[in-house]
A protein has these predicted regions:
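Generic hydrophobic transmembrane alpha-helix motif, especially the helices
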Residues: 74-110, 117-118
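Transmembrane alpha-helices
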Residues: 101, 105, 137-171, 194, ...
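Alpha-helical membrane-protein architecture signal
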Residues: 9, 27, 31, 35, ...
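Short cytoplasmic-facing helical segments at TM-TM junctions of multi-pass membrane proteins
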Residues: 110-156, 184
Length: 220
């Protein structure tokens, strides 16, 4: 049965009274679990940004590359994270890099697609001026494309962060270890419904904070 709001609130107070306790690898406070999940998200998302943003620029800039890569993106983009995770486990032989790989491959596509669309929508007049001035490809990318593409790029980054946080919860449920996803699954095995409800709110709040942080960066 579902716990009452009062019982859930009492469980939350008790849970957050000591969020960083450590009684061994399989019994750590919710604070540690959130931090471990955020660390994996940071690594997977960071690698996705390092690959996805330059790739998006190249796809948007060169029509031939766009025609070559677009079908592959359309093929891979809809694949569920739960399908990518076994591939990661097979290749890396460990849960942590497999989870990071899953975040990488699932969160890269919004950045690639939005960056490419932004580059394609840069006014042709800007590029004509660049050709007249005989600007190098690097100067075109940094002085013309990047400022014009920035709104699209930031939208892609926001979508990717949301995807990364969504994926890590599912991945950790299957891989185990320390992380908010594993913590939820462990509480389910213990039939601790109060903690599961609390985790739902925690996952939502952390996702909201990540998005607000990116909005703050975008305004600057």
């Amino acid at each position: 049965a579902f716990p009452t709001p009062a019982a859930t609130f009492d469980a939350a107070v008790k849970l957050f009274s000591d969020p960083f306790y450590d009684k061994g690898p399989n019994d750590q406070g919710i604070g540690w679990n959130i931090l471990f999940s955020l660390q994996r998200v940071g690594l997977g998302f960071g690698m996705a940004a390092l690959v996805g943003i330059p790739l998006g620029f190249l796809i948007g800039r060169f029509a031939t590359l766009n025609r070559m890569v677009s079908p592959l993106i359309s093929l891979l983009k809809p694949v569920s994270p739960l399908a990518w995770l076994p591939i990661g486990l097979l290749v890396f032989k460990a849960a942590d890099p497999a989870a990071i790989w899953t975040i990488f491959i699932c969160s890269i596509w919004p950045m690639v697609i939005n960056t490419a669309v932004g580059v394609q929508r840069v006014p042709e007049d800007y590029l004509n001026v660049a050709r007249v001035l005989k600007l190098s490809e690097w100067k075109i990318a940094t002085r013309i494309l990047l400022p014009s593409v920035m709104p699209y790029l930031l939208t892609g980054v926001r979508l990717s962060v949301g995807t990364a946080w969504l994926v890590i919860v599912a991945a950790e449920m299957l891989t185990g270890g320390v992380g908010i996803g594993f913590w939820v699954w462990d509480e389910w095995n213990n039939l601790n419904v109060e903690h599961i409800l609390i985790a739902i709110f925690v996952v939502g709040i952390v996702g909201l904070l990540l998005e607000q942080l990116l909005l703050l960066v975008a305004r600057r």
